[in-house]
Structures are given as C-alpha cells and as structure tokens.
Amino acid sequence: MLRCQHNAWIHLGLTIVAIGAGFFFGLSSREWCWIILAIAIVWTAEALNTAFEFLADAASPEFHPLVRDAKDVAAGAVLITAIAATIIAAIVFWPHVAELLKWSNGVLE
C-alpha cells in the first residue's frame, strides 16, 4: 500500500503520532483499545480500497465513469473511517492534553 497509495503515508504518519502520544500520555488499557481499534479500522479500509482499485483497474483498464464512481465510493469509505478515528482520538486524548495544558501554564485552571 505504501508503494502506491499516497494517503497510506499520511495514515502511517498519523499512526506513529497516535502511538507516540499514547506512550507519552500513559494511556489506560481501555484507551489503548480504542486507539488500536481506530488505527486498525483505518488501515483495513485503506487496504480494501487499494485492493478494490487494483481489481477495478484490472477489470477495466480504460476509463469508465462507473469504475471512477466505484473508486470514489471506496475512497469515501476510507475518509469516513479516518474521520471516525479522528473523533475517537480526540475523545481519548483531549483529557490528557487538557491536563497537560493546565499543569504547564494554567490555561485551563
């Protein structure tokens, strides 16, 4: 996937950031479960999207509007999972970030 999908590199970078932040903030087991689930869902969607694109290209090497539309729908599924993962990350990390800000400079006191 990383060889052919530009967005996979973005997902990889954000995966590394999420895992690093998890270690930095000392997430609980329950929080880790949510983060790992979110990461796994995004990577699964990206893998399925990539496989679908390969199959569509093999079935119809020339341009066809229905193939384009099908690829757009598959890419949209990845976007939906990425948005859901972002929401999960915000819910998990916000209390930790808020506590860090409160502790470091009194912003949230």
Each PLM stretch: what is its role?
Residues V67:
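Histidine-centered, metal-coordinating catalytic motifs and their short helical/loop contexts
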Residues L2-L48, A59, F63, K71, ...:
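Hydrophobic alpha-helical transmembrane segments
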Residues E53, A70:
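Residue-level signal for inorganic ion chemistry
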